[in-house]
């Protein structure tokens, strides 16, 4: 799955001063940042802010109306999206990397998962297989499904096929949101995802 590591910085420097910050890297790409101060530990960071893919949650009507939400995270990373969870929310996360899966739950490194305000279930497996099992089990559909598995060097194309997209929509509520994070240093995924949107008449 490539080299992963956590970099510790202090207020944006390495001089040991300021606020301690942990940054999660996979290769040369930073996939998660946490401010290691209690009053700031649940602050969404990086591309998970309300101005990034976090808007799929933050901008949802149920979030604004303080109603319970069900959120599925495909590509757990360090679980930054759990920062949005509230007491009655349910979050489900998938990841295929044993190292990433373990690190996300190590509260010495990151606490988004361990200190999550809502209920969190995590699975170390291929997300598509896990979702197929959820569908077979008749789970309650989700309000938001966020696919964040395409930012690395190796693209899991089976998570972007028509069959995969069909699966996501089967597991979404009628007013649900499907968010696909397409940032990638090597490939331009926008045309492909745009075609999917047109095919499904998504606005």
Language-model features: locations:
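Receiver (REC) domain switch-region micro-motif
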Residues: 71, 145, 178
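Short SAM/SAH-binding signature in class I
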Residues: 140-148
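Glycine/threonine-rich flexible loop motifs
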Residues: 152-160
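A short glycine-rich, Lys/Arg-flanked "PGG" loop and its adjoining helix->strand segment in the class I
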Residues: 160-174
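Conserved beta-strand signature within the Rossmann-like core of class I S-adenosyl-L-methionine
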Residues: 175-182
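Short "lid" loop at the C-terminus of a central beta-strand within the Rossmann-like core
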Residues: 151-152, 183-187
